From Swiss-Prot:
It is an enzyme of class 6 (ligase). The gene is thrS. It comes from Ectopseudomonas mendocina (strain ymp) (Pseudomonas mendocina). One of its GO terms (molecular function) is tRNA binding. Residues 1-61 form the TGS domain. HAMAP family: Thr_tRNA_synth. Its EC number is 6.1.1.3. It is found in: Cytoplasm. Binds 1 zinc ion per subunit. This is Threonine--tRNA ligase. Homodimer. Residues 242-533 are annotated as: Catalytic.
Length: 640
């Protein structure tokens, strides 16, 4: 009979097969009441599942991250229960867990409205209050098919067809409603009280716009009402910081239907963009990169040789001319190999670091586009390092150091680093993978910072390092990457003359720090709520006169600051000074300079910040020196 080993090493023996819940009951009533599911020998199971052999067991409760996922998945099923009660003709599709929530795709003959969402949420709350048990039944495949056929759930039947090897399937019953799932799920609806439906959108069956359109209901669920309230508050703050809203408020950019996924940069936004580009250009030059420029439109022959045509063609914009097929480049890598291939390269030429602010275009689905965060036309701070295998560790270590410095300059210091290792389907010998993963791991260790493995998440040809930033709202943004690639040099016949006078393939390290400029600027807008640090602000200082008598000195102050390399503007409108101050505060200009008669006499400016802090009156030269200090600190000003 089973002996159960618990996480603390203690053991409990039973004289009969025992469920996860029964083990929890043997430990204590409090734990039993909180039990959602279990992990038996590392595998998640339902609380009702029976253990009949010796095993390790971890009880999963709402306090566990895995517990939250189970709550959210069960809430998705609860959406199905409520929808089928309110709209019996609706057909249920899929309801997975996503980051901080869940959704359910539903086929129905009309779009859901906000009133529908409110009704569904109300019915879900009523069902939760019934505290009914969720019943699991492992059911033979034929019976599952017959059940869903009798209920007219055609999408469930299609999903079953996708799993030909499954002989039995888990059915989860919410009273009269039933759904198919691997589980686990909550044992009772009392665990689902802290939920909220958040929005409705359209979706396509299997994510393909050629298929029928579905309605997608999004929601979130948490362990308790306190966590839910904190999440709602965070989402409300995120909405206030939405880069699309602030982009319009600060006149940074716009998007329009005639160019979906393409950004129209306005002067203010283009200023921010140029500051980023000039900064990255300087950083890369100081770290041994040489800048190149490659064509936007390239013959399909190159994309076929690189492998992109067979694997990525549907995401490429194509055109034809004079009986030749071309593609607008979706990435820069094959073109950089062409530059490397010009002229004979020696081991003495390596490492060669080619950088490009490369404009790329990808035919993203229209439903996936999101402001400037997810676009079709974008520019990357892209670079490729061609090096020997022995140079990989140092190049990776230098890149990690550089990347963390850049993020700190933008005000990001909470960085997660992950090493994605060999997937099941891969090319190359085990020895090559060992060396590649070892070099990247050693480089990460040299940083002195914590990092973690992502087993099996590497590309089929090599491991990679990923950098994820956490912003002021606690959201994670995956930005930087370093990808080890011996494959593309092989496909595109890149080589160098080694010390032994034989030709060898270089290792190619694909790397980016910001990712796309568009997405990174969107992140900065939301992180700072539009209140950019002085070095990034489109206008760093605005000079305002009180009356026309101070206009000449105001113009002189503007000219002096601009000639000193700052971005200053003058506001000479015949408006009250309070009105001007309020307007430029709303425009989030870092420094507001007021000039009255006394300032003209003393050739000074009265300085206040956009936060309303009065810095007093000071000579213009002194203000310029202080502004220079703020600019020099970049985004580190709040971190020191």
């Amino acid at each position: 009979m089973p002996t159960i080993t618990l996480p603390d090493g203690s053991q409990r023996s039973f004289d009969h097969p025992v469920s996860v819940l029964e083990v929890a009951q043997s430990i204590g009533a409090g734990l039993a009441k909180a039990t959602l599911a279990g992990k038996v020998n590392g595998k998640q199971v339902d609380a009702c599942d029976v253990i009949d052999t010796d095993a390790t067991l971890q009880i999963i409760t709402p306090k566990d991250e895995e517990g939250l996922e189970i709550i959210r998945h069960s809430c998705a099923h609860l959406v199905g229960h409520a929808v089928k009660q309110l709209y019996p003709n609706a057909k249920m599709v899929i309801g997975p867990v996503i980051d901080e929530g869940f959704y359910y795709d539903i086929a129905i003959d009309r779009p859901f409205t906000p009133d529908d969402m409110a009704a569904i949420e109300k019915r879900m709350a009523e069902l939760i209050d019934k505290d009914y048990d969720v019943i699991k039944k492992m059911t033979p495949r034929a019976e599952v098919i017959e059940l869903f056929r009798s209920r007219g759930e055609e999408y469930k039947l299609r999903l079953i067809d996708d799993m030909p090897d499954e002989k039995a399937m888990g059915l989860y019953f919410h009273e009269e409603y039933v759904d198919m799932c691997r589980g686990p799920h909550v044992p009772n609806t009392r665990f689902l009280k802290a939920f909220k439906l958040t929005r409705i959108s359209g979706a396509y069956w299997r994510g393909d716009s050629k298929n029928e359109q579905l309605q997608r209901i999004y929601g979130t669920a948490w362990a308790d009402k306190k966590q839910l309230a904190a999440y709602i508050q965070r989402i409300e703050e995120a909405e206030k910081r939405d880069h699309r809203r602030i982009g319009k408020q600060l006149d940074l950019f716009h998007l329009q239907e005639e160019a979906p996924g393409m950004v129209f940069w306005h002067p203010n936004g283009w200023t921010v963009y140029q500051v980023l580009e000039q900064y990255m250009r300087q950083v890369q030059r100081e770290n041994g990169y040489v800048e190149v420029r490659t064509p936007q439109v390239v013959d399909r022959i190159l994309w076929e040789r690189s492998g992109h045509w067979s694997n990525y063609a549907e995401n490429m914009f194509t055109t034809a001319s004079e009986n030749r097929d071309y593609a607008v480049k979706p990435m820069n890598c094959p073109c950089h190999v062409q530059i490397f291939n010009q002229g004979l390269k020696s081991y003495r030429d390596l490492p060669l670091r080619l950088a490009e602010f490369g404009a790329c275009h990808r035919n993203e689905p229209s439903g996936a586009l999101h402001g400037i965060m997810r676009v079709r036309g974008f520019v990357q701070d892209d670079a490729h390092i061609f090096c020997t295998e022995d140079q990989v560790k140092k190049e990776a270590a230098d890149f990690i150091k550089l990347t963390l410095q850049v993020y700190a300059d933008f005000g990001f210091t909470d960085i997660a680093m992950k090493l994605s290792t060999r997937p099941a389907k891969r090319v190359g010998s085990e020895e090559l993978w060992d060396r590649a993963e070892g070099a990247l791991a050693d480089a990460l260790n040299e940083s002195g910072l914590a990092w973690e493995y992502q087993p099996g998440e590497g590309a089929f040809y090599g491991p990679k390092i990923e950098f994820t930033l956490r912003d002021c709202l606690g959201r994670n943004w995956q930005c930087g990457t370093l990808q080890y690639d011996p494959n593309l040099p092989e496909r595109l016949d890149a080589s160098y003359i080694a010390e032994d006078n034989n030709r060898k393939r270089p290792v190619m390290l694909h790397r980016a720090i910001l990712g796309s400029f568009e997405r990174f600027i969107g992140m900065l807008i939301e992180h700072y709520a539009g209140s950019f640090p002085a070095w990034l602000a489109p206008t760093q200082a605005v000079i305002m006169n009180i009356t026309d008598k101070q206009a000449d000195f105001a113009r002189e102050a503007e000219k002096t600051l601009n000639q000193s390399g700052f971005r200053a503007k003058v506001d000479l409108r015949n408006e009250k000074i309070g009105f001007k101050i309020r307007e430029h505060t709303l425009l989030k200009v870092p420094y507001l300079l007021v000039i009255g008669d006394r300032e003209v006499e003393t050739r000074s400016v009265a300085v206040r910040t956009r936060e309303g802090v009065d810095l007093g009156s000071m000579p213009l030269e002194q203000f310029a020196a202080q502004l220079q200090q703020a600019v020099s600190r970049r985004g580190r000003q709040d971190l020191e």
